[in-house]
């Protein structure tokens, strides 16, 4: 969003959040360029999804004014895609997001791949992106791996929180990560080196 947040510190990198673009399976949209003239949700205003969508569009060379953008959270976007009221939606979240899995169970969907060139541009221009593969079978009906980019979900704390408490918190998270993973369905990727 371009805003600077002060009085916070990064504690640990938790898990990758994949940049995902969902379309109906019967759609003629195969690439980012095919979004031209389409109704596309880029995420809620000032959300991480919106920021990622804008960066992806910028690096793809497709001017955003050539797309009929909507600002929907991904629950509303999934409902509107199923109803045929939008053509695609961007969202950034851990792979196998429940909302998309539920959508896939009653509406045939596809995820768009980001080609090598676009992923290279993104990771060069914005070093917080990494290449990411959403494995086949992550969502119902997904028959192939999807190549995209991801950002890391970061645990932050107030600068006022003392280091001893931060250390205790991270130790607890690392000790109970299997339970956290089960409770959240998120692919936590914690290790001692991810603590910041």
Please name every model-derived segment.
Residues 138-196:
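Segments of small-molecule ligand-sensing domains
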Residues 5-8, 16-18, 37, 106-109, ...:
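Extracytoplasmic
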Residues 57-59, 105-106, 171-175:
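Short, solvent-exposed amphipathic alpha-helical segments in soluble enzyme
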Residues 27, 63-154, 161:
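Pocket-lining segment of extracytoplasmic ligand-binding domains
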Residues 4-14, 138-146:
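A structural signal for short loop-to-beta-strand junctions that line the ligand-binding cleft
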Residues 16-83:
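Bilobed "Venus flytrap"/periplasmic-binding protein-like clamshell domains
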């Amino acid at each position: 969003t371009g805003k600077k947040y002060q009085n916070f510190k990064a504690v640990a990198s938790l898990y990758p959040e994949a940049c995902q673009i969902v379309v109906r399976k019967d759609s003629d949209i195969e690439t980012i360029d095919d979004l031209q003239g389409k109704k596309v949700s880029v995420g809620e205003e000032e959300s991480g999804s919106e920021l990622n969508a804008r960066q992806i569009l910028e690096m793809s060379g497709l001017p955003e004014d050539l797309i009929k953008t909507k600002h929907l959270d991904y629950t509303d976007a999934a409902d509107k895609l199923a109803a045929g009221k939008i053509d695609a939606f961007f969202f950034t979240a851990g792979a196998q997001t429940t909302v998309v899995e539920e959508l896939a169970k009653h509406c045939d969907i596809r995820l768009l791949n980001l080609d090598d060139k676009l992923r290279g541009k993104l990771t060069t221009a914005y070093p917080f992106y990494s290449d990411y593969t959403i494995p086949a079978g992550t969502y119902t009906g997904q028959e192939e791996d999807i190549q995209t980019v991801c950002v890391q979900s970061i645990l932050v704390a107030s600068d006022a929180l003392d280091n001893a408490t931060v250390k205790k918190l991270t130790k607890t998270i690392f000790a109970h990560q299997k339970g956290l993973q089960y409770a959240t369905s998120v692919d936590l990727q914690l290790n001692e080196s991810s603590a910041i």
